[in-house]
Curated annotation (Swiss-Prot):
Gene3D superfamilies: Ribosomal protein S8
This protein's GO CC annotations: ribonucleoprotein complex; ribosome
Keywords carried by this UniProt record: Ribonucleoprotein, Ribosomal protein
Annotated GO MF terms: structural constituent of ribosome
Keyword Repeat annotated: no
GO biological process: translation
Organism domain of life: Bacteria
Pfam families: Ribosomal_S21
TM region(s), chain numbering: none
Family, per entry: Belongs to the bacterial ribosomal protein bS21 family.
Source organism per UniProt: Helicobacter hepaticus (strain ATCC 51449 / 3B1)
Record protein name field: Small ribosomal subunit protein bS21
Amino acid sequence: MPGIKVKESESFEEAYRKFKKQTDRNLVVTEVRARRFFESKTEKRKKQKINAKKKMLKRLYMLRRYESKL
């Protein structure tokens, strides 16, 4: 569970920003959203396939972009 130590000199906005960054890093919000509704195994697999395809296309794009600079 995320938690931060606030210094006396820190403002509320700075402390809130730190807390928000920590929750984003720990994927707390995304996990809660994912568990909000039941997801069947087929839906999970479908999402995993879509994410894998996106990741592959992103890597391919980055590789082509890198090669074009050479």
